[in-house]
């Protein structure tokens, strides 16, 4: 019989002095919670302090995903349903994320004093270089909604070399005209600030339906302790300048762009017009059926798939698993061969290209997808 030998087994991760297995598990859980919550920073800029939260660690030769939220929201209420969606984890594990809160919109923000001059949207865009310098990040992929989409677009116009791509949801690149101002003033006489902001965020059909989502966000805005700050951000949005996009001109976005809007959303016409002004070789247009005014809240799965395609076209996520939009495309191409036009809008795909396929490389044409 072979002689038994004593074998000493040591832990792969030895416990700290005085640490029990139970406390080690608690420490590991606390670390995971901290990682999930991100790290919040504030930086001073020429236009005041701005707060942002960083998730993950920088990846070599990869840009940061950089988000900016809409009026009435902060980064959590605007983007958490999207970035916590299951299929999105494949993306976020490959990129560091920076979520910006507009001044005074972060959780626990004090109310600005009476007479405080809130930054314009152009000035909010001018804060972004201070954030990137603080983090030592050189390039970003921007994801913005509403006012945030405008801010990121303004930044991209001023600093094109630092923006690799933009996902712009509900962007309105135009300044308010006289008719818009008159309607806004008239609405202000009969509606509260929360009601006006809700009308900006959601369609009338959604507001009339009063779903759980609408009830949730109505409560968030109506009972916000920083409602005065929200009104200042709202006023800055309504005083925005025209971005003056011009197809074929000097004033245009130089990076790949994905425009996103919900079918019958409040900003559908504005996004369609924006699409007509951008470079068709760099722009894709995603119109999402049954998503309402905030597709990142109501259809995070479809938007995640579109985002994966967008990143793949930029040379990232090449081996990513595409599912929902792939099935939608297959059904659409089958539908296109049929005379029957009664098929659901959620299964249609139309492109200005005659290839009949989604681009696998950088965007080469304007495409419109209803999914």
UniProtKB/Swiss-Prot annotation:
The modification Phosphoserine is found at residues 326, 328, 332, 335, 338, 344, 350, 352-353, 355, 370. InterPro entries: AB_hydrolase_fold, NDRG. Expressed at highest levels in brain, heart and liver, and at lower levels in kidney, colon, skeletal muscle, adrenal gland, ovary and uterus (at protein level). Residues 1-22, 334-371 are annotated as: Disordered. The modification N-acetylalanine is found at residue 2. One of its GO terms (biological process) is cell differentiation. Keywords: Acetylation, Cell projection, Cytoplasm, Developmental protein, Differentiation, Neurogenesis, Phosphoprotein, Tumor suppressor, Wnt signaling pathway. It is found in: Cytoplasm; Cytoplasm, Perinuclear region; Cell projection, Growth cone. GO terms for cellular component: cytoplasm; Golgi apparatus; growth cone; nucleus; perinuclear region of cytoplasm. The modification Phosphothreonine is found at residues 20, 330, 334, 348, 357. It holds the Pfam family Ndr. Belongs to the NDRG family. Contributes to the regulation of the Wnt signaling pathway. Down-regulates CTNNB1-mediated transcriptional activation of target genes, such as CCND1, and may thereby act as tumor suppressor. May be involved in dendritic cell and neuron differentiation. Interacts with CTNNB1. This is Protein NDRG2. It comes from Mus musculus.
């Amino acid at each position: 019989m072979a002689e038994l030998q004593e074998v000493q087994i040591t832990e792969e991760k030895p416990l700290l002095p005085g640490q029990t297995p139970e406390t080690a598990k608690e420490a590991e859980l606390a670390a995971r919670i901290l990682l999930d919550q991100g790290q919040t920073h504030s930086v001073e800029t020429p236009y005041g302090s701005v707060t942002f939260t960083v998730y993950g660690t920088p990846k070599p030769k990869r840009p940061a995903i950089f988000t900016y939220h809409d009026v009435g929201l902060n980064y959590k209420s605007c983007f958490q349903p999207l970035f916590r969606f299951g299929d999105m984890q494949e993306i976020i594990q490959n990129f560091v994320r920076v979520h910006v809160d507009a001044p005074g919109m972060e959780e626990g923000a004090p109310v600005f004093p009476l007479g405080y001059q809130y930054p314009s949207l152009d000035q909010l865009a001018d804060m972004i270089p201070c954030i990137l310098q603080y983090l030592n990040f050189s390039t970003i992929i921007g994801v913005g909604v509403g006012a945030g989409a405008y801010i990121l677009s303004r930044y991209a116009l001023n600093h094109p070399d630092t923006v690799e791509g933009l996902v712009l949801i509900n962007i309105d690149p135009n300044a308010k005209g006289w008719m818009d101002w008159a309607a806004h003033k008239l609405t202000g006489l009969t509606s509260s600030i929360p009601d006006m902001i809700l009308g900006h965020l959601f369609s009338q059909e959604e507001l009339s339906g009063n779903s759980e989502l609408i009830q949730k966000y109505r409560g968030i805005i109506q009972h916000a302790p920083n409602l005065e700050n929200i009104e200042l951000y709202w006023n800055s949005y309504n005083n925005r300048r025209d971005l003056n996009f011009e197809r074929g001109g000097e004033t245009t976005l130089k990076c790949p762009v994905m425009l996103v809007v919900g079918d019958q959303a409040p900003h559908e016409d504005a996004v369609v017009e924006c699409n007509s002004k951008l470079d068709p070789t760099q722009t894709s247009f995603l119109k999402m059926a049954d998503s309402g005014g905030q597709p990142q809240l109501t259809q995070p799965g479809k938007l995640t798939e579109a985002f994966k395609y967008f990143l793949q076209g930029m040379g990232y996520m090449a081996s990513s698993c595409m599912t929902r939009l792939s099935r939608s495309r297959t059904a659409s191409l089958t539908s296109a061969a049929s005379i029957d036009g009664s098929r659901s809008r959620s299964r249609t795909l139309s492109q200005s290209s005659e290839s009949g396929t989604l681009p696998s490389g950088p965007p080469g044409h304007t495409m419109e997808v209803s999914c």
